[in-house]
Amino acid sequence: PLCRAAVAGGKLVCRWHGLAIGAHGVPGWEPLPAHDDGVLAWVRLDSVGGEEALPMPVLPRRPDPEISLDAVYTGIGRCEPEDVVANRLDPWHGSWFHPYSFVGLRVVEEPSEDVDRFVVEVAFRITKRIGVPVRAAFSCPEPRTVVMDILEGEGAGSIVETHAVPLGVDDSDHPRTAVIEATIASSPRPGFAVARRGASLMRPAMRWAAARLWRDDLAYAQRRYELRSSGRWPG
């Protein structure tokens, strides 16, 4: 696959055929606008989106890459992007669906005309009796992205970006949506610098933690889609 191709002289070189594709493409191959933000790679599909094209993705404030650690999780569900976004914007779902990870959740700020965000206080479980309290804000920089920003507590300044990407429909004509979630962690603690040096070990652990949560959250999103599409969604 071309995703594993080499880059030489500004051209993408297929490792199998030796085909070299430059910035203007070749017959049968058309380049697409792309953007690498340092954590995620984006491709702009103008003919698919049906929306006004932007010069680059809408990104939130991120921690300094020199002192942060990132990991990306990808999952796919039978639902639409709005179901994924609804899951992330349900401020109470953390305690309801993930009691093994969160405890003592309290909504302290709701969206208003001036500030369009939720703010919650919650503790991340370490053991049954020990948790790490934080204050976190949830907001949407664009319609298919939800950002959790740690405002206070352990890891303040860290963020979790959740992007809901439509993938078309499956063989049964049901929509498929990819959840692409980037966790970008930062901490002033001396031990975090050690963790960054062990990034090759930390990233799989961070992806595992995200996958554990999304096992439940995708079930939520898929159930929501099932109720909506069958006319059983309340209201």
Protein language model features and the residues they cover:
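Rieske [2Fe-2S] iron-sulfur-binding domain
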Residues: 1-59
